[in-house]
């Protein structure tokens, strides 16, 4: 049931839990492919390099979404943006599950990354509508859901890929996103946009913040380097661990 939200007046516990869970389900789409790259490479008869591009392009899509999609939350109704992105996610995940063509998988992996950024809209919702006393706790809960999705996705993907094939996890992911669409339609109220202007003005304001605050530039650079190093290690390590240690997807 939809509940009216008022700024700084509190966020219903049911809605908070819903957003935290959906945040984890949504961001998990970025990582399902990582333990399965070797299996995908063998099944599609492509090189390890090309298979690794799947994980890389997915993360590039995520970066594009953070830069160009998330700001739309200030320009349009957030519920509409969430529903559109989740719908595109369903189509992208089903395409990955069904297509035999690696180039189409690469393209839909890019779309998957772009549209998996919606948890970054949930976090401002929690901050905006929570009371001052619960703001930090509620934002932390959404972030916890997000991190749980990141960690659990690899485990679930490896197990399902080992016993049911690598395509099955993407069918499961698409089904979960359909459920998320239905839940968002039912429980998330319309939140009016709070920016009056054009998209170009909105993007200019983002870049002006980067130019104005050196701490923001340093923090962004550090986070980018750390996250890039993490992904560079773990996306390529799956191939080497399976080859050298003969580990299966469930272990990876």
Which functions belong to the PLM regions below?
Residues 64-102:
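Conserved MFS/SLC helix-loop-helix module at the cytosolic interface between two early adjacent transmembrane helices
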Residues 31, 59-67, 117, 150-151:
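Residue-level signature of mid-helix packing/kink "hotspots" within the transmembrane helices
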Residues 104, 141-186:
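Helix-loop-helix hairpin linking two adjacent transmembrane segments in secondary transporters
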Residues 2-9, 189-220:
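Juxtamembrane intracellular "pre-TM" segments in multi-pass secondary transporters
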Residues 40-41, 72-73, 152, 156-164, ...:
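Interfacial helix-cap and linker-helix signal at transmembrane-aqueous boundaries
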Residues 108-144:
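Cytoplasmic helix-loop-helix junction between adjacent transmembrane helices
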Residues 12-32, 110, 213-232:
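Pair of pore-lining "gating" transmembrane helices in MFS-fold secondary transporters
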Residues 17-48, 119, 233-238:
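Extracytoplasmic
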